[in-house]
Curated annotation (Swiss-Prot):
Keywords: Developmental protein, DNA-binding, Homeobox, Nucleus, Transcription, Transcription regulation. This is Homeobox protein Hox-A3a. The keyword RNA-binding does not apply. PROSITE patterns: ANTENNAPEDIA (PS00032), HOMEOBOX_1 (PS00027), HOMEOBOX_2 (PS50071). GO terms for molecular function: DNA-binding transcription factor activity, RNA polymerase II-specific; RNA polymerase II cis-regulatory region sequence-specific DNA binding. One of its GO terms (cellular component) is nucleus. It comes from Takifugu rubripes. The lineage of its organism: Eukaryota, Metazoa, Chordata, Craniata, Vertebrata. Disulfide bonds: none annotated. InterPro entries: DUF4074, HD, HD_metazoa, Homeobox_Antennapedia_CS, Homeobox_CS, Homeodomain-like_sf. GO terms for biological process: anterior/posterior pattern specification; embryonic skeletal system morphogenesis.
Amino acid sequence: MQKATYYDSSAIYSGYPYQSANGFSYDANQIQYPRTSHVESEYHRPACSLQSPGGSVALQKREMAAENCDRTTAVQAVQSKVHPESNQPQVPVSAPPPPPQSPGAISQTTSNGSNQPTAKNSSPTSASRGKQIFPWMKESRQATKQKSTSNTSSVESCPGDKSPPGSAASKRARTAYTSAQLVELEKEFHFNRYLCRPRRVEMANLLNLTERQIKIWFQNRRMKYKKDQKGAGMMPSPGGQSPRSPVGPGSTGAGGGGYLNSMHSLVNSVPFESQSPTSYNKPHQNAYGMATSYPPPLSSSHNNCPPTQKRYAGTDSATPEYDAHPLQGNGSYGTHMQGSPVYVGGGYIDSVPNSGSSVFGLTHLPHPPSANMDYNGAITMGNSQHHGVCDPTPTYTDLTSHYSQGRIQEAPKLTHL
């Protein structure tokens, strides 16, 4: 009703003789205003269209643009008389204005009604602008989250083997090799620890595996091999001997079972760094092939003798009991029996000037001439090697009854070592 009243009042005021023909206004507050044709051209002026999107914006800027809006009100009044039918369809569509408090408020209401198409045109722009800001930003954030999650999942899935055990989604399935595949892989690793690519392709086709699986298996197998080698290298050698010693760990089986292996004898004779003058080979029962060489003593300057006798029990009837025999020769006792255990016994080689062998005085010097070989070992040792400081009566039990002359022929086989 108020809207109709406003429009009726404008029609009443427009009934005064000063109308649009002269360009004067009906209101004392207004000055002259343009013609109707000019009003038609200025129908969409931007002066009040800035305030058209909402009534709240119009109220906020009412004081600033009062003159422009009043002028637009007068123009609308003239247009309402000239074109009454064009404004009537716009009345119910116009936004509800705030309650009138002054003629400025009335002019604001009329301006809202007159500039409704502009409001319609500008409101979609603001709505589209809002859609461009908030939903677009929200969608981009979701897309960013999706991209970040996809990137992280791809990064986690790329290492494969190195993925943490907790990430179940990106954890690579463990490859289960069959026994046939493992046999072929181990066989190939035995011959060649590093595979070339053609061979890897061939094995991949043969075992129905991928090249990557075979490559990774060989990498893991090489690491395991290195660990095994490192663990074996840290342990002492089986014989406890110098690396240049020709006597192997399996040589104890050829000698008598009562003879200690070289590692144990080394522990028992730590102060002594020499070989025993005797070595035994057991080709058959109780037959000992003894290859002993005793160069004549150069001097009798022996420092000490072992404090106790070392008893080494032979097999069956052969139980030799003898002490260590310090010799000051070249340190080569010629104990070169093939496959016989070496007794690292109690000779003192501290004062040996010309010993070119290792610290153990092992069998690296040339074999003494066969003229020094005496198979009657007890007599030779008793006559030429025992001195008054040591025990003068070493006992050799039943050794001279089983010497085999033919076993000494095996001795020169290892002299080149």
